[in-house]
């Protein structure tokens, strides 16, 4: 895979992510804020963006979404086998909920 292919894949991922984020925010704002890990301010901006603005933002060569697994405890919950999947998901949700939301810098 060459550099241009990677940039194209990143743009496609960005577009999908932004469109999904808008849909999630429109359907259930509180759940979307939690799941996306974004601030109210960023949510407001995403909801008011036009399709042309979404496409333009998605066209960057940098990924707009990121892994929220900065904490080794969260990554451990995902990678280690657990007998109780419900408990595993609950623990992960609690750990993710403690993380600060993304702010616009």
Curated annotation (Swiss-Prot):
Keyword Transcription regulation appears in the UniProt entry: yes
GO BP annotation list: bacterial-type flagellum assembly; positive regulation of DNA-templated transcription; regulation of bacterial-type flagellum assembly
Recorded GO CC terms: cytoplasm
Source taxon at top rank: Bacteria
Pfam families for this protein: FlhD
Principal location listed in the UniProt entry: cytoplasm
InterPro entries reported for this sequence: Flagellar_FlhD (IPR023559), FlhD_sf (IPR036194)
Statement: the UniProt record of this protein carries the keyword Transcription regulation: yes
Keyword annotations from UniProtKB, A to Z: Activator, Bacterial flagellum biogenesis, Cytoplasm, Disulfide bond, DNA-binding, Transcription, Transcription regulation
Subcellular location, record wording: Cytoplasm
GO molecular function terms noted in the UniProt entry: DNA binding
Subunit architecture: Homodimer; disulfide-linked. Forms a heterohexamer composed of two FlhC and four FlhD subunits. Each FlhC binds a FlhD dimer, forming a heterotrimer, and a hexamer assembles by dimerization of two heterotrimers.
Function per UniProt: Functions in complex with FlhC as a master transcriptional regulator that regulates transcription of several flagellar and non-flagellar operons by binding to their promoter region. Activates expression of class 2 flagellar genes, including fliA, which is a flagellum-specific sigma factor that turns on the class 3 genes. Also regulates genes whose products function in a variety of physiological pathways.
Protein family membership: Belongs to the FlhD family.
Entry text on domains: The C-terminal region contains a putative helix-turn-helix (HTH) motif, suggesting that this region may bind DNA.
Protein name as it appears in the record: Flagellar transcriptional regulator FlhD
Annotated source species: Ralstonia pickettii (strain 12J)
Lineage: Bacteria, Pseudomonadati, Pseudomonadota, Betaproteobacteria, Burkholderiales
């Amino acid at each position: 895979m060459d550099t241009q292919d990677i940039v194209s894949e990143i743009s496609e991922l960005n577009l999908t992510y932004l469109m999904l984020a808008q849909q999630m925010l429109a359907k259930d704002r509180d759940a979307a804020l939690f799941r996306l890990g974004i601030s109210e301010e960023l949510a407001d901006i995403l909801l008011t963006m036009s399709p042309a603005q979404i496409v333009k933002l998605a066209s960057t060569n940098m990924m707009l979404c990121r892994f929220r697994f900065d904490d080794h405890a969260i990554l451990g919950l995902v990678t280690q086998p657990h007998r109780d999947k419900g408990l595993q998901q609950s623990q992960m949700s609690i750990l993710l909920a403690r993380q600060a939301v993304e702010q616009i810098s």
